[in-house]
């Protein structure tokens, strides 16, 4: 593996996996970030962090330089789920600030691609698709849907399909 993601729930003061009030400059007590990052580095694996967009918006000026210091490879920013003018500007501010700190970006819960990655090549991908994670709660992601993506969504650029969504196999 080239990269690994530390998904939702790692940041301090979070009250749940979709918490928008956590402190993304600190971890919960159960997460020893220096130890995780050292182990990943020993295996030649770079680490990404999941962020709720509201936390990124509130703390990016403080957090992104910290992540660069930690050696974080990239950020998976989630739950924007809209494409109004303010949010489009937010995307631009994030990728610009991330580029300044050598961070890759994956916008999850994102609107359709708009060419921003041409200006900011650190914008690796964005979701904008009904991906594999939906198999945890829906039957809509099926072989026909997956084939269709190559001829529809992928024409607009790379996508975050979220491969590897796990579910409770005892159901």
Predicted regions and their residues:
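Aromatic- and carboxylate-enriched substrate-binding clefts and catalytic-loop regions
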Residues: 5-171
């Amino acid at each position: 593996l080239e990269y690994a993601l530390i998904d939702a729930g790692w940041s301090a003061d979070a009250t749940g996996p979709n918490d928008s009030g956590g402190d993304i400059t600190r971890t919960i007590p159960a997460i020893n970030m220096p130890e995780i990052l050292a182990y990943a580095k020993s295996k030649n694996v770079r680490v990404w962090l999941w962020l709720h967009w509201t936390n990124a918006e509130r703390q990016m000026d403080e957090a992104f330089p910290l992540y660069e210091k930690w050696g974080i490879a990239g950020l998976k920013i989630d739950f924007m789920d809209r494409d109004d003018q303010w949010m489009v500007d937010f995307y631009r501010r994030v990728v610009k600030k991330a580029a300044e700190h050598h961070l890759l970006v994956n916008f999850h819960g994102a609107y359709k691609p708009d060419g921003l990655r041409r200006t900011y090549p650190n914008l690796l991908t964005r979701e904008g698709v009904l991906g594999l994670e939906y198999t945890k709660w829906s039957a809509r992601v099926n072989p026909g849907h997956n084939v269709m993506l190559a001829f529809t969504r992928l024409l607009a650029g790379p996508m975050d399909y979220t491969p590897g969504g796990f579910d409770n196999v005892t159901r």
